[in-house]
Amino acid sequence: MASKKAGGSTKNGRDSQSKRLGVKRFGGEKVLPGTIIVRQRGTKFHLGNNVKMGRDYTIYSVVEGLVKFERFSKERFKVSVYPKAV
């Protein structure tokens, strides 16, 4: 017969893994085509020039250039990539 009392179970101890969302390339940074600029859930940032959106709302560059975040209403931003002037 066991002489050790059974330990109680806990209802805590679960958490989801972080999804590493957020801005990956900031304003003024140089990017290449295909570079991820923002990972997000929903459209926290909207599309500007020379960027596209993936099916998970990831915004990425389609040209080589510099990233620019532009405010287009009181609390909304759009992300653009402008080619460097030659």
Curated annotation (Swiss-Prot):
It comes from the Bacteria. GO terms for biological process: translation. The keyword Ribonucleoprotein applies. Residues 1-26 are annotated as: Disordered. GO terms for cellular component: ribonucleoprotein complex; ribosome. Transmembrane segments: none annotated. Keywords: Ribonucleoprotein, Ribosomal protein. Pfam families: Ribosomal_L27. Signal peptide: none annotated. InterPro entries: Ribosomal_bL27, Ribosomal_bL27_CS. The keyword ATP-binding does not apply. One of its GO terms (molecular function) is structural constituent of ribosome. HAMAP family: Ribosomal_bL27. PANTHER family: LARGE RIBOSOMAL SUBUNIT PROTEIN BL27M (PTHR15893:SF0), RIBOSOMAL PROTEIN L27 (PTHR15893). Belongs to the bacterial ribosomal protein bL27 family. This is Large ribosomal subunit protein bL27. It comes from Bdellovibrio bacteriovorus (strain ATCC 15356 / DSM 50701 / NCIMB 9529 / HD100). The gene is rpmA.
